[in-house]
Structure formats: C-alpha cells, structure tokens
Amino acid sequence: NIYPVKGYSITVGLNDEASQAAAPQVSLLDDETKLVTSRLGKDRFRVAGTAEFNGIDLDIRADRIKPLVNWVNECFPGVDTRRVEPWAGLRPMMPTMLPRVGAGKKANVFYNTGHGHLGWTLSAITAHQLAGHVLQNMGQTVRSFSTPTPAAAAA
C-alpha cells in the first residue's frame, strides 16, 4: 500500500534588504532538526520539514508551522518573519520507505511512486530506470542522460 504523508513548509518573504542579506544563498540541511532550506531568488526563502501520517488531510496546523518560523528566527535573526506563507502537501510513501518502481499486475501499467520526501531527488533516476525496463521489453534501448541526442552530436 502507498500512504499519504503530509509535509509542511513555509516560504518567507524577504521584503527588505536586511532580510535578503541575512537569508542563506545556498540550500541547507539541519541534521538535528531535519529541516531543509532553499533560497528562491532574491526575495523568497523556503524552509521545509516534518512529516505527519494523518490520512488525506491538507489542513495546515499552526503547531507544525510555528517551529519552522521559530527555527528561522533562531538561525537567521536578521530575517523578518512577519510575512510567511505556510503550505502543506501530501507525498506518496511506502511503509518500507522504498519507492514502488516497476510493472503492475495489468499489462502496460507501470509504477514510479512512493518516494516520500525524496520524490524530487529520486523520481528522475527511477523514471529513467523504468523507461529502460519498458523499452527493453519492447526490444529497444534507452539512452543514458549523458548520451547526446543525434541532433546535439551533429552540432
């Protein structure tokens, strides 16, 4: 079975020069709190973390957002957190935390799901592997990501 796991994030509006200067320019991972950050251009900063097993529920709980805001205030005191946009979304996850990648029980049905919080990280490579499996069954091959297309090789 695949289960919905709710993840939370906040996007902090960096509305002034002091906040823009105080927010990190690179992505960070706080191993202790398991929070990750991404700078989104000049005027936005995202902090994401936490996981909640709560069925198909997209309600945004204040008690899940507050620690994210507090973390920004503690780690980056120069960032103004008065303008914060909370978000919650469901990520498909398997109980084993391993994605389901491969053929389904019915003909021509294939799965590439259940990556959980590593969806953006792993889904491209597992899609590539799955494409290879599908094409191999059709008697074809799939080019690797680094193989230039014929048009690119001719240029």
Regions found by a protein language model. Give the residues of each.
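C-terminal lid/capping helical subdomain adjacent to the catalytic/cofactor pocket in oxidative enzymes
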Residues: 14, 98-155
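Active-site substrate-recognition segment that forms the wall
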Residues: 1-107
